[in-house]
Regions:
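Alpha-helical transmembrane segments and their membrane-interface boundaries
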Residues: 2-141, 150-152
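Hydrophobic alpha-helical membrane segments of integral membrane proteins
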Residues: 59-66, 154-160, 173-174, 186-187
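Small-residue-rich segments of transmembrane alpha-helices in multi-pass membrane proteins
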Residues: 97-107, 162-174
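Small-residue-enriched core segments of transmembrane alpha-helices in multipass membrane transport
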Residues: 65-70, 133, 161-169, 192-193
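Structural signal for the N-terminal portions of transmembrane helices
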Residues: 91-92, 157, 161, 181-193
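Alpha-helical transmembrane bundle and helix-membrane interface signal
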Residues: 23, 148-156, 176-183
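Transmembrane helix-loop junctions at the membrane interface of multipass transporters and ion channels
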Residues: 83, 113, 117-121, 170-191
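Alpha-helical membrane segments and immediately flanking helix-loop junctions
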Residues: 139-143, 157-167
Length: 193
């Protein structure tokens, strides 16, 4: 029994390849920046997601999820909570609110000028969240925590970005505003939150 316990502890040891606190902090800081590359990628991800939703293209929407920098600010909020840094949590939360507002505003403009106004199945899928969406967010967040704290870069963070699908609900909320549909707007924001 002791041998089995030792083997299990060895197999599930998360400290073996853990990055230093400085490395973790630096990664999270760089992912939470709201300027330069991160802002350019945010804009591009929003347009890619909006076009994918408009054209009903799952592959394009997944591409937008992969490049979206929204995960960085959310990780920063979690890091601030974990380190009891309320000022950092507040600063990161304000950054997230800015990103949310910016994405909704720009996607609203996109959908307002888009010649395609019919709701695709991809748009509809983001208006009725279920308990499964909550579980995906919970387990995705846990995987993200483990992934960002490793010494070596892994494919965990892109996988979490796809699983949690942050950008498409914001763009769907923009669609709801552009088409004056409270159902799309409220359902998509509920899914995002």
């Amino acid at each position: 029994m002791d041998y089995l316990k030792k083997v299990l502890l060895d197999v599930f040891d998360l400290n073996a390849d853990r990055a230093s606190m400085e490395e973790i902090s630096e990664r999270i800081e760089s992912g939470a920046l709201l300027k330069g590359t991160n802002m350019a990628i945010l804009i591009l991800a929003m347009f890619i997601a909006s076009i994918g939703l408009n054209m009903n293209s799952t592959a394009v929407i997944i591409g937008a999820m992969l490049i979206s920098p929204l995960m960085g600010v959310i990780m920063a909020i979690g890091y601030g909570i974990a380190t009891y840094d309320t000022a950092y949590v507040r600063k990161s939360f304000l950054k997230l609110l800015f990103q949310i507002g910016f994405c909704i505003l720009t996607s609203t403009i996109y959908f307002y000028i888009s010649p395609i106004s019919t709701a695709s199945s991809e748009l509809l899928a983001r208006t009725e969240p279920t308990i499964w969406d909550v579980l995906i967010a919970l387990f995705g967040g846990l995987a993200g925590i483990i992934g960002i704290t490793r010494k070596e870069k892994s494919n965990v963070i892109p996988g979490v970005a796809i699983a949690t699908a942050l950008m498409p609900p914001l763009c769907t909320a923009g669609y709801g505003i552009a088409t004056h549909s409270l159902k799309f707007f409220s359902g998509a924001l509920y899914l995002f939150c």
